[in-house]
Amino acid sequence: MGIETNRSTLVYSLIEGISFGLFDNYQALSKTGIKLNNLFVIGGGSKNEDWIKLLASILDRDLAITEASDAMAAYGAARLAYLGYNNLKHEDVLRPPSVKKVIEKDNSMSPILQDRFAQWKNYYVK
């Protein structure tokens, strides 16, 4: 950051940093052997398609915006509680949500963002 840093650059760096944090978590989850077939975007962040495009490009995967994305976190918590309380198989309760729109990754941005992620990780993840 310097005197030339403007509001747009600052906001972009904030969003990029949050996205890198999500990518770092995604990598950790992937290393556990859990197969991540589909990735869904829910909540307030799902309203900004530019951010989702950036995140998809960092993850190098397309991302799906769900129907009723504002309610999906509460809906997911309720389904997990129902699953635990009723001792059911997860296949009976945890079905994929309805997809409103798929945001495709930008293949031209992925290599650039991977380099920037490596720099971010070098500074922030110890």
Per-segment meaning from a language model:
Residues 1-126:
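Glycine/Thr-rich phosphate-binding loops that ligate phosphate moieties of nucleotide
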